[in-house]
Structure formats: structure tokens, C-alpha cells
Amino acid sequence: MQGTFISFEGVDGVGKTTQVERLRAYVESQGRECVVTREPGGTALGVAIRKMLLHGVDTGDENDCADIAPRTEALLFAADRAQHVAEVILPALQRGAVVITDRYLDSSLAYQAGGRELTAAEIRNLSMWATNGLLPERTYLLDMDPAQSHARLQHAEDRMEAAGNDFQRRTRVAFLDLAEREPERFHVIDASQSIEDVWARIKADFDTVSTADGGIA
């Protein structure tokens, strides 16, 4: 059986984790293997990279962390993604599983090329090389005004979340631009709706994607 590859994208606080878990439960209720993962941090190597990306580099001074240059940040994301595909995503797809990832290469394009203002073509080429061109069959972009989504956060801000309102707004615009360029892959959902309404839209769309792949009928 062919596997199904699904990604969830959006700025922080839009409710990706909640919907990922809903989709996991739905897939498993149909008797199909479901692998849920995330970027960065989907592998042991990724966990180490995630710590650097989200919290900076430990300098030995508890009051100071060395920041990461934008190009270095992009390379770290690509390294995490390459290992993630080789170790987790591709083997699961080859087994016929549904793979759901909380963030994938579109986050690099939105955060580095949009938020960090690096060159989009360079970021995309790097990500496609790292993944050997592997793209999700469907990407659910949960869209919300960053000011609204930021208010939902219930934990201390990490490095990305603390980057400022302008950064978050540029990132949201970059996500929407990506969706406009690839409408056959992206499904944009207004994340300011209720959890149930968001889930209903995801479920209805996922059923069409999975049926096309020979999965849930």
C-alpha cells in the first residue's frame, strides 16, 4: 500500500498540535498505521538541532546564548530535515503508513525566506536537496493573524516566537504566498474558527486525499 504524507503549517499558536492529534486518532481508528513527527526534532539528531534553533547556542553563561546567523539557521533546518526524511518519513511511507509532520520545508521557506529575508530560491533548493525532492501530498496551512495566535501561546517564548511582530507578519504573508503558488498541495484553513470547525474541514479534505492514495475509503 502506498503511504500518505501530510504536513501542517502556520505561525505559532494556530492550533497545529491539536489538529495533528485529531488526524492521528482518525487515521488509527480506520486501522491504518500513523506516524506523527515534527520539525525540527523528529530524530535524535533533530532534538539536538531543535534545542539550538529554538534557544540559541549555550555559551556557558546562563544569562547569555549566542545567536545563530540566518544562513547557519537555514543549514541547521536542512540538516534536521535530511535526517528526518531518511530516518523517519521515507521508511514509514514505504511501509504504507500515513505520515503527519508538524512543520516541513514550507516552514523554512516562510521563516527563513520570509521572516529572515533570505533568498527564497536558495532556501527551496537547499530543502529540496536535503529531502531528495520529497513533498507532502497535502499541506494544511492553519492561518490566523499572528497577534491573535500569539495570545494563545501558553509557554515561555522560544527564539522564533520572540522574534517580533513584524517577523511574524512577514512569515504569515510568506506562508500564504506559498499556498497561492501551489494550490494543488495546500489547503488553507481559517484557524480562528472553532477547533471542531477546523477539524471538520481537515477531515473532509483528508478523506479525498487518502482515498486517492488507496487508503481510507
UniProtKB/Swiss-Prot annotation:
<protein>
    <recommendedName>
        <fullName>Thymidylate kinase</fullName>
        <ecNumber>2.7.4.9</ecNumber>
    </recommendedName>
</protein>
<comment type="similarity">
    <text>Belongs to the thymidylate kinase family.</text>
</comment>
<dbReference type="GO" id="GO:0004798">
    <property type="term" value="F:dTMP kinase activity"/>
</dbReference>
<dbReference type="InterPro" id="IPR039430">
    <property type="entry name" value="Thymidylate_kin-like_dom"/>
</dbReference>
<keyword id="KW-0545">Nucleotide biosynthesis</keyword>
<dbReference type="GO" id="GO:0006233">
    <property type="term" value="P:dTDP biosynthetic process"/>
</dbReference>
<dbReference type="InterPro" id="IPR027417">
    <property type="entry name" value="P-loop_NTPase"/>
</dbReference>
<feature type="binding site">
    <location>
        <begin position="10"/>
        <end position="17"/>
    </location>
    <ligand>
        <name>ATP</name>
    </ligand>
</feature>
<dbReference type="GO" id="GO:0005524">
    <property type="term" value="F:ATP binding"/>
</dbReference>
<dbReference type="GO" id="GO:0006235">
    <property type="term" value="P:dTTP biosynthetic process"/>
</dbReference>
<keyword id="KW-0067">ATP-binding</keyword>
<keyword id="KW-0808">Transferase</keyword>
<dbReference type="InterPro" id="IPR018094">
    <property type="entry name" value="Thymidylate_kinase"/>
</dbReference>
<dbReference type="GO" id="GO:0006227">
    <property type="term" value="P:dUDP biosynthetic process"/>
</dbReference>
<keyword id="KW-0418">Kinase</keyword>
<dbReference type="GO" id="GO:0005829">
    <property type="term" value="C:cytosol"/>
</dbReference>
<keyword id="KW-0547">Nucleotide-binding</keyword>
<comment type="function">
    <text>Phosphorylation of dTMP to form dTDP in both de novo and salvage pathways of dTTP synthesis.</text>
</comment>
<dbReference type="InterPro" id="IPR018095">
    <property type="entry name" value="Thymidylate_kin_CS"/>
</dbReference>
<dbReference type="Pfam" id="PF02223">
    <property type="entry name" value="Thymidylate_kin"/>
</dbReference>
